[in-house]
Amino acid sequence: MYIRTVEIENYRAFKSFKIKLSPLSLIIGENEAGKTNLFDALALPLNSNDISFNKKRLSVSDINREAIKDFYQAIINGKGDDEIKALIPKVRVEVEFTDPKNFIEEGVIGKWIIGEEADESYKIRYDFRPKDADHFVKSAKELLDGIEDIKETRWFNLPIELYDYDVTQSNNGLKVSYSDLRLIAINSINAERDDFAENNTQKSNNILTKMLISALEDSDKAKINSAYTSFFDEIESTETFKKIVTPDPDFENFFDEIVDKLECIPNLPNLKSILSNITLKSGESYLYQRGLGYRNLVFIYLLFEFFKGNKNALNLCCIEEPEAHLSVNNLRFATDFIYKSTQKGGSSLQTLISSHSPQVINKLELTNVIVLSGNEAIHLTDSKKHLTNYLRKRPNFDILKLLLSNKTVLVEGTTEEMLINAILYRNNKNLSSLEVISIEQTGFITFMDVWLQVNKGKPKKKLSIIRDYDDNNATKDKHQKYDIENDNIRVRTTTQYTLEDDLAGTAGNLHRLNTLFNKKCKTPEEMAKFLKNSKAERMLKIADSILDEMNKDPIMLSKHIQEALDFMK
């Protein structure tokens, strides 16, 4: 089974948010998009693991600011109590489970069923709200007494001490028992893990101790206690130890009559005390002596192995930014390990990964990718797998730049990319916010389709397509349709066959190009033929001439490129 949907209300940045998940989901988005908040929200209705602890009682800073503002505004405006109560800032996290695979999983979630059994929908919810709505509203009114402007209020003054939480079944409101909830665990490998094994009192010791204690069978614990007793016997047999507890020979009779024979026996400590003295070594060095990236790799490996091995009905493993501090090779190893582990994890393992790395994204099926944008969770679709296959052929293609950059220009090849980057650098405008990406092919339809899934109708996001005509009107019309139907897409095609033809034909460029290459071409067609003979090398020379600040008459851009760049201003 797995968690299919999560609904969040009034938790941190989420005013009203819903996301659909799969057994393996990769979540991407810009900074502050809410990836960490999503993982934290999931921990509220679910059981924490043995390694980390997630508090379920929230603070006022965890409540959505907009919800608090709306509540305050209703009081200031003198709304009726019923309307004010409806606006009380309440945090709700509702989780839907589906697809139980065996009687154990059905036994755990069966009582949470919603609607018809055929739908296989089982829900529980976490609520953080005032215990007494009337008393809460009265307290809030007293707090805002005399205030007439919302700007005079303070969100952190909300009487949070009147709140309480509970985890209930969505179908009948009954509390979820701990015995059921303990079989559904959320396990988080968060992004802030730099202190793992950073010194000789490292966090790795604590984690390893907890892992061992929770995993040891009773028979193993008995063996450890027995071994500890044997270890103590060896200590007791040392000469120094004997001297401490053996009386002076001159007083043997005194001790025989008054004091029983003194012996030392082990004060058997609990397992935590014994196991906490174990530390990790890698090669010939302590783990804390290894590099930060290596420690992060070990951290992910240890925890993910431990989490997926838990004998629960569901293990939800959340991994934040697995790429943190990892080299190219180690990141490849980590992504392979996570991906293959999820494939073999069975129905009890569900994995959520957040990432900023194209290498992690390209490793997985595109249909597993979810883009967080505002209060939306957008699932990428690739029905014909055109983009998935493209990413498999170009594993280093940065799809994040395509999807998340505010201004993106897609071009066919490196020649256009060199030319445009040179112009941008010379003009020094839009350079920091404009991404120029070469797709190394002629068709842009697939890229525009996936870009629109995330950015359709968003005026702050712009995409320009710069393409060659190639004497193909049908293909030109297919691309131009996207320009016509979308205000934030601009498609521009060469007038003639390719870029070189249009560049040579641009007013004044024939003279400029003849001067640059020391040629005497009489027509643009003749110059275009020359440029095509060694495209990359000659475009590089053109780009260098544009970058030369001493050149007061640089090559001019052709009309289709200039219009595509003007659209970005």
Give the location of each predicted region:
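Extreme N-terminal "head/tail" segments of very large remodeling/mechanoenzyme assemblies
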Residues: 1-26, 30, 42-85, 92-100
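Switch/communication elements of ASCE P-loop NTPase nucleotide-binding domains
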Residues: 1-47, 273-275, 279-401, 478, ...
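Conserved catalytic network of the ASCE P-loop NTPase/AAA+ motor domain
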Residues: 19, 83-88, 117-119, 179-182, ...
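Glycine-rich phosphate-binding loops of NTPases
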Residues: 57-211, 218-223, 485
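Flexible glycine-/small-residue-rich
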Residues: 97, 128, 190-193, 282, ...
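Short helix/loop capping segments that flank catalytic or ligand/cofactor-binding pockets
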Residues: 103-106, 136, 197-200, 289-290, ...
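Extended helical coiled-coil dimerization/tether regions that scaffold
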Residues: 195-316
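Acidic, divalent-metal-binding catalytic cores of TOPRIM
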Residues: 361-569
